[in-house]
Every structure is written in structure tokens, then in C-alpha cells.
Amino acid sequence: MVDLKRIRQNPEEIRQAIRLKGVDLDLDALLALDREVQGLKARLQEIQTQRNRIAKEVPKAPPEAREALIAQGKALAEEARKLEEELREKEAHLQELLLKVPLPPWPGAPVGPDDRANVEIKRVGAPPEFPFPPLDHVRLLEKNGWGEPRVSQVSGSRSYALRGDLALYELALIRFAMDFMAKKGFIPLTLPSYAREAAFIGTGHFPAAKDQVWPIAGTDLYLTGTAEVVLNALHAGEILKKEELPKRYAGYAPAFRSEAGSFGKDVRGLMRVHQFHKVEQYVLTEASLEASDQAFQELLQNAEEILRLLELPYRLIEVSTGDMGPGKWRQVDLEVFVPSEGRYRETHSCSALLDWQARRANLRYRDQEGRVRYAYTLNNTALATPRILVMLLENHQLPDGRVRVPEALIPYMGKEVLEPCV
């Protein structure tokens, strides 16, 4: 959410952000509604002043004037009741519009309507050159007996189950990522995979991406697609001390997404599934661009180091204004090479949101001067599986169809090669 004062004082800045990010929002309608709300509040204040005056005059008024004053007071009370009802409706509508207001992006963001305007800024590692015909990850699963095809009969499409060494490998990856983040000074948390609507509004997933989220029938809860939803709500309503910042968390939770709108995309294998496992980096900083940028670089470097330890070729993408989402100040994606597709696919998304989420979730701290301010938030994936398994299987496959284990994972697996499950 953007500060309403900023919107009033800099409407052209916000209008530009709406254009750059392709947000469907009529700013003039929002500002007109804001003026109506302010007018209603002013009139209610006038009425309250008049009622206070009448309340003081009634006891002193002569009998012939008292009845008229009482009638006037009742008329004002009735007017106030109607205006308060109108005010509640208009404030609710204004709040709905404010939730759609995008954060102006940082000046270095590529300008464009979608991912075609994204810019590659760095490439690390070379794609593998195989002296044998390489297999895609689906064939590797079939050849080694690492998948359980019957699960689709039980759980439907876009579900998966792993067997043997690959099941242990997935668990090893999660523990590896949590250990890595703990060594970096982040507090590890295991989190629930569900939250109330307010938490989704706080991150910005609601109302825009509500179709991507599954509600839990008969409750006020929804399944989360990332631990960010719960992490961002942990300090909602609190006023932290400046000395407590930054808060640095590594949250693990199973994640769920409906994949609405992805019909026909990645229908085979592990690339796009309904349930997956994700370790999320999350940082809460003071309201300072310097502090935010420092945390952004830290989150980015953590993700890069993880990919290097996994011995995967990757690149960094500076995300364009039209692709980054309404709440982002800056976004850099990390993409890993997929040999069977001959292209890079996203595995991480590093985002700085300044106070956009903090205002929605009411995340505050008290600065050194004693002022209460909204904090800044940032997040990035540490590791998400099974998508990362696609890259690991395909990039590290051996001529006989087995898969090499990166050196950093050998202590977790107790072996150097993933063996078939027969």
C-alpha cells in the first residue's frame, strides 16, 4: 500500500507507476472518492460541534426554546447516523482502491509491459556439454524408478511423488537450505501452510492473485503458496524497537498453488505442480533505502551461493516494470539452465518492497527519535523443490542414467550418486 498523503501530493508519480506496471486503476476516481471521504468527515465534525453546543445550551434555555433545541439535536443525530453509514461504505471502497495502488519502481528497472523487457545482468557457469544423448528429467524419473505414477490417480493432475534416493534427495535439499540460512544468521522457522485472509492482503497476494490460492472449506483460512505470507504477518500490529532490526528469517513450509491460468504449461514432470516445498528468505529492515539495498544484496548473494554449491549454471535477470508486480521496488530473478529445453527457467525471485507490504500488514518500529514508522520488507527464495530437482537431475546426469550428487549435498545423502529404485 502507498501512503495516501503521497498519492495526494504526487498524483503524477502514482499515475506513472500505474502506467509502468500495467495496473487497472482509475486514479482520478480514487482521488475523487478521497475528497468525498474528507468532506463527509468534515461535515460529521461540524455536526458533532453543533451537538456539543446544543447539549450545553439545553439546560440553560428557557422552556419555550428547549424543545426546539432538542428537536434540532435529534435532527443532527439522524443526519450524523446517515453520514456515518455513507462514510463507512465510501471508506471501504477507498480501501479497496488503495490496495491496488502500485509502488513506483526503482529508477534502474527496465521499462516494458511484460517479461520480454527483462534484462540479463549476469551469467555464471556454462551449460553442460554431454558426450552422450542426455535425457529430460521425466525420462530420468522413469528410467530410475524415482517417480510414483500411481499418485495421479489418487491426487489428480499436477501432483507428484518421489521414490528411493530421489525422495531422500528432496528432503536433503530442504535441510541443506535451512542449514545454509542458519549459518548466515537467519532464524530458521518451520511454518504452517495456511493463513487468514489478512495475511494474504498483507503480502499483496490478495486481492490480485486470489485465484491462485485454495480456500479451506468451512474456515476463514487459505493454503499458502509461500512461507512469505506467514513470515510477513508475524509482527503485524507490533511496534518493534529499531535495535531489533533487521529481522532475518528463513521459513520452511509446504506450499500450494492452484496454477489457475497455466493450462497446457509444463504438464509433464516436476516443473509446475500443485504442492511443493519451499525455504523462503525474509527480511524486515528500518525505513532506509540504504538498509533495504544492503538486505537485497544479501538475499541475492545467498541465493547465488546456494546455486553455486549445487553446481548449477544460472543467470540473473533484472525484471521489468510490467513484470515485477505492483508492490515491488526492485526485483531480480535467478534462472537455472534446463538442458532438455535449451533455456533458463526461474528458480528464485528476489524482491524489495519498501513499505508497501508493511503498510498493508501494519509492520512498524520506533526510530531513534521516538517516531513510529513503517518498516521495509524484502524476500527471496532460498530453495524450492521439486523445481530445482529438474535442474539437478538434468545437469548432473551420467551416461548410465544415474545422477551425480553435488559435493555440498554428499554429507546429507551419504553417497556420491543417486541410485535407481528397483
Q: Which role fits each region the language model picked out?
A:
Residues 1-128:
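N-terminal alpha-helical targeting/anchoring segments
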